[in-house]
Amino acid sequence: MLDFLTPLLFALILKDMSKVRVSAYSVSLDGYAAGTNQSLENPLGIRGPELFQWFFPTRTFKQMQGLEGGSTGVDDEWARRGMENVGAWILGRNMFGPVRGAWPDDAWKGWWGEEPPYHVPTFVLTHHPRKALEMKGGTTFHFVTDGIHSALQHAKDAAKDKDVRIGGGVATIQQYLRAKLIDELHLAFRPILMGSGENLFVGLDLATLGYACTQHVSTEHAMHVLLQKQT
């Protein structure tokens, strides 16, 4: 009987250890995680690319593009950690594309071409139904219309004993934070002031929500801060 139960107990322990997390999320010193006037031509918004200048040079990012080279060191370490042990992603609709309202057709398949960088089931929050979209490289987009809790349950089921990564955008992360559903956040603070855009911290009291800084390290390009839920 014990031999039969051991794999089940082990699976339950692993599931308990899996996390819901935000990783490698770039933020300006004044809290902005995206620029203004995001569009098809400028998906990160005005000055948005500046937020990722710690990430773009890394070996991890180069490998995601199918390229060789790239920097190693602390920035690359955090970038790589963000991609490890991820069994499913959750994205807000804006992270999938610029289309608003009801889907006019199925032509839009995301910002990333035929092979997105996720490689696991990816759940997109939306108010408008759409059939699942299977892409090259293991990514399947599932469109969830019944809220953040439903999306998280689907993602946990798909991830099995691995982590669920919340990819953004700002509004999506804020919803999950307010619901106290995120276990940890890795924020990469860039030494820039944006002045406008989408501010991650507006209306949030992270201390009251139970988060505390458990690790921080600085490089030339970013200060990496790990916030973990304490209660």
PLM regions with names:
Residues L2-T231:
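Enzymes that bind and transform nitrogen-containing heteroaromatic metabolites
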